[in-house]
Amino acid sequence: MNSESVLEEIVLELYRNKLFKIGEYRLTSGKISPYYIDLRILPSYYDIYSKIIDISLSKLEKLNFDIVVGIESAGIIHASFIACKTHKPVGYVRKKPKQHGTKRLVEGIVADRNVLVVDDVATTGGSLEHAVNAVRSMGGIVEKAFVFVDREEGARERLKRLGVELISLMNIWFIINVLVKHRLIDEQTYYLIKNYLNREKHS
């Protein structure tokens, strides 16, 4: 089975297990979206998660990085799995510095290291930009960031302006096209999501 076939099966499993949902959902950015990708509970589905991690590793195997850094909170567990599988150390970036103890924003030794920043889903790229800036402020080198899903709402362009390449396992168009192919969403839903994405792309 080639990688695209594996990804197609992953999309179908995400849909069957209600990790991809249709409806009105408020995102972290405050925007209302006609769909939601809930990858926070993904590790609870071992069969799906192991497939995603394995195919992610094949996508990352040629990259040069010294440490994997996840973004609080969803990105931490994914970064941990990737780090373990690639025999690399792991760290994470907090949303806000600790209010006690060391008061660190970045946990892990990143200075003078090539850092791979990891999160579950990229939307506008705000959380990724925060992580990149935090790691760089500690002397880390960030040239690549990785997510499972790119919602195609500006994150890639935002990171490019920072000199960071966003690598994604799949994007929302791939997911939607798979669901249409298998008749899991109707034409009205397809155009609702398409119009939303086109609007956000140019906002």
Curated annotation (Swiss-Prot):
Key words of the record: Glycosyltransferase, Magnesium, Pyrimidine biosynthesis, Transferase
Residues reported to bind 5-phospho-alpha-D-ribose 1-diphosphate: 94-95, 98, 100, 119-127
UniProt superkingdom: Archaea
Entry cofactors: Mg(2+)
Pathway(s): Pyrimidine metabolism; UMP biosynthesis via de novo pathway; UMP from orotate: step 1/2
Listed InterPro entries: OPRT (IPR023031), Or_phspho_trans_dom (IPR004467), PRibTrfase_dom (IPR000836), PRTase-like (IPR029057)
SUPFAM superfamilies: PRTase-like
The protein's enzyme class: transferase
EC number, as in UniProt: 2.4.2.10
Molecular function (Gene Ontology), one example: magnesium ion binding
GO biological process: 'de novo' UMP biosynthetic process; pyrimidine nucleobase biosynthetic process
Catalytic activity: orotidine 5'-phosphate + diphosphate = orotate + 5-phospho-alpha-D-ribose 1-diphosphate
UniProt-annotated binding residues for orotate: 123, 151
Family: Belongs to the purine/pyrimidine phosphoribosyltransferase family. PyrE subfamily.
Subunit note: Homodimer.
Annotated function: Catalyzes the transfer of a ribosyl phosphate group from 5-phosphoribose 1-diphosphate to orotate, leading to the formation of orotidine monophosphate (OMP).
Protein name: Orotate phosphoribosyltransferase
Lineage, opening ranks: Archaea, Thermoproteota, Thermoprotei, Desulfurococcales, Desulfurococcaceae
